[in-house]
A protein has these predicted regions:
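A glycine-rich phosphate-binding loop feature that marks nucleotide/adenosyl-phosphate handling sites
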Residues: 12-15, 22, 38-53, 170, ...
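ALDH superfamily catalytic-core signature
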Residues: 287-293, 314, 320, 327-472, ...
Length: 598
């Protein structure tokens, strides 16, 4: 017959083609498949060639009444954050259009500063100016904490329901201004669009979660048991002025989460963003002020840590510090707080980690590879939870490395504003130089498995190519490597204890992962490894507020966990009130009980 035909003949190895064949048989054998319907005389040509996307849009949407909508998964406690459906072409086109039209941004402290404006440049292309920022000087830092100290009393006296309602209102404003926040995360912090949307959503979750927790904890004092004729009440109270110091890698979520917890507890806040992401911090504070939080309860203070941080921490009006960043900086803050004769003040510190994932021979390698790509290279590896080490059992190591390096070759490195980008830049030139110096050392001490190529579009940005090295032991890592560099270590069956010891020897305890389908192995690792967040058969990033409270132990932080039910307690102090109720002339409680019995 004069009909053109096409021969469909996949070529490859048995291990690749067999699962492909099975998938095709299942797809083509289904009643709804094109192959099945094309020989059905009852199927019209129009039905066979109809656009599947248009057909899908034409279906009536029916929701199971027992399954809550995503926005309602937390029930009456709080509303879930909303984002952007990045799989919807129309939503993507609208997001891209709005991102392209965002104006330059500018930031200055909430108090007067004599510092001149500084340009803020895009880490993806240092030739592009995003806006400008005025940093605070030492005198401005003193004015900021004085302002917060004056405003703290009035803020504390507001009912907890009112403070919580302002946080809820702020969350709504963050959702309304999601595009502006995402745009700053992309252009100022170098985050991909996917990561930027997640950053904003997490901030919204923090605002609503801490508002809900404040209502639960602070609504009324807790009455404690005791003898008749006596009443004992335990109540929680704010500490005073809190200083919050946030990192640049989560310029919305962590910055907002710290100050939201302090505020809803009744403290006033001096909020210092990371130097590199002051524009994003300014917009966050502007939105919270628009929600109704007073300017003297939340004081925005961008500046260099060595200048303003030193002043804030040493000031006797500072009642506590919430810090997220490097372990070295946390130690410096702790020493500065302890060096005064002021009352002992809490330091809430969430620091870094040398996070490892252990894979045994029973693991599903396809899942291991995908989870490793997410854990090690999302956000260019600039997450405190990111995976730094992959322990893989020797029996499957070659296959795992082959699959991993092949998958790394598919990573798109480039402008984070492009939706196809998987890996964006690191934050600045100093970070880039430090990572490349580490890579040079790893080439000498280990074996380079893969190094991505950077194209010309990356020439003017602070890009570090995703890399993987094989090393003989974890102890070759002397500090946290904060970027897209993965280290692979082989381990032999029967030597799991040595792996556990190697992880423990780092002193860190933030995140840890296990890939195994053997319950005994999972139980051994999860019960013996001391880490704040342990994940089994999934990636080790993306902790969800209220579901996976986040924070480490050892060198990884002080606790309590952010996004957990105990976090607000670190911003509060306890007071016990004991009243002798019999002092009014009789034991009314006892007399009431006797009357009831009669």
């Amino acid at each position: 017959l004069p009909v053109p035909c096409r021969v469909y003949a996949p070529v490859g190895s048995h291990k690749d083609l067999l699962p492909y064949l099975v998938r095709r048989l299942l797809e083509n054998g289904a009643n709804s498949s094109f192959v099945h319907q094309v020989v059905d005389r009852r199927a019209s040509l129009e039905a066979l060639t109809a656009d599947p996307v248009e057909r899908l849009r034409g279906f009536a949407s029916k929701r199971h009444p027992a399954i809550p909508r995503p926005v309602d998964i937390y029930g009456h406690e709080r509303r879930n954050s909303e984002g952007v459906d990045l799989s919807d072409p129309k939503a993507l086109a609208e997001l891209a259009r709005r991102l392209a039209s965002l104006p330059a941004a500018h930031a200055r402290p909430g108090v007067e500063s004599r510092e001149p404006p500084r340009p803020v440049c895009d880490p993806a292309d240092r030739r592009r100016e995003v806006g400008s920022v005025v940093f605070a000087d030492a005198e401005a830092a003193e004015r900021a904490i004085a302002l917060a100290h004056r405003g703290q009393g009035g803020w504390e006296r507001r009912p907890v329901e009112e403070r919580a309602a302002l946080l809820d209102r702020g969350a709504d404003l963050f959702e309304r201004h999601l595009v502006e926040l995402v745009g700053l995360c992309v252009r100022e912090a170098g985050k991909t669009v996917l990561d930027a949307v997640a950053d904003v959503r997490e901030a919204v979750d923090f605002l609503r979660y801490y508002a809900s927790e404040a209502r639960r904890l602070l609504g009324r004092p807790t009455e404690l048991p005791g003898p008749t004729g006596e009443r004992n009440l335990l109540s929680l109270h704010p500490r005073g002025v809190f200083v919050t110091i946030a990192p640049w890698n989560f310029p919305v979520a962590i910055f907002v989460g710290q100050l939201a917890a302090a505020l809803v507890a009744g403290n006033s806040v001096v909020a210092k963003p990371a130097e590199a992401t002051s524009l994003t911090g300014r917009l966050c504070c502007d939105l919270l002020h628009r929600a109704g939080i007073p300017a003297d309860a939340l004081v925005f203070l961008p500046g260099e840590g060595s200048v303003v941080g030193k002043v804030l921490v040493a000031d006797p009006r500072c009642a506590g510090v919430a810090f997220t960043g490097s372990t070295a900086t946390a130690f410096a803050i702790n020493r500065a707080m302890a060096a005064t004769d002021q009352p002992l003040r809490p330091l809430i510190a969430e620091t870094g980690g040398m996070n490892a994932v252990v894979v045994d021979s029973s693991a599903l390698l396809e899942a291991v590879v995908q989870d490793t790509l997410d854990s090690a290279f999302r956000s260019a590896g600039q997450r405190c939870s990111a995976q730094r080490v992959l322990f893989v059992q020797d029996e499957i190591a070659e296959r795992a490395i082959e699959m991993l390096t092949g998958a790394m070759a598919e990573l798109a490195v480039g402008d984070p504003g492009q939706l196809a980008t998987d890996v964006g830049p690191v934050i600045d030139g100093k970070a880039k130089d430090k990572l490349l110096a580490h890579a040079q050392r790893m080439e000498r001490e280990g074996r380079l498995l893969y190094r991505a190529r950077l194209d010309e579009a990356c020439a003017h940005g602070t890009f570090v190519p995703p890399m993987a090295f094989e090393i003989d032991r974890m102890s070759r890592l002397t500090e946290e490597v904060f970027g897209p560099i993965l280290h692979v270590v082989r381990w032999q069956a029967g030597h799991l204890d040595a792996v556990i010891d190697a992880v423990a020897a780092t002193g860190y305890g933030l995140t840890f992962g296990v890939h195994s389908r053997i319950d005994e192995t999972v139980e051994t690792l999860t019960s013996r490894v001391k880490a704040g967040n342990i994940y089994v058969n999934r990636n080790i990033i993306g902790a969800v507020v209220g579901t996976q409270p986040f924070g480490g132990e050892g060198l990884s932080g002080t606790g309590f966990k952010a996004g957990g039910p105990h976090y607000l307690l670190r911003f509060l102090t306890e007071r016990t009130l004991t009243v002798n109720t019999a002092a009014v002339g009789g034991n009314l409680q006892l007399m009431g009980a006797l009357k009831d019995e009669a």
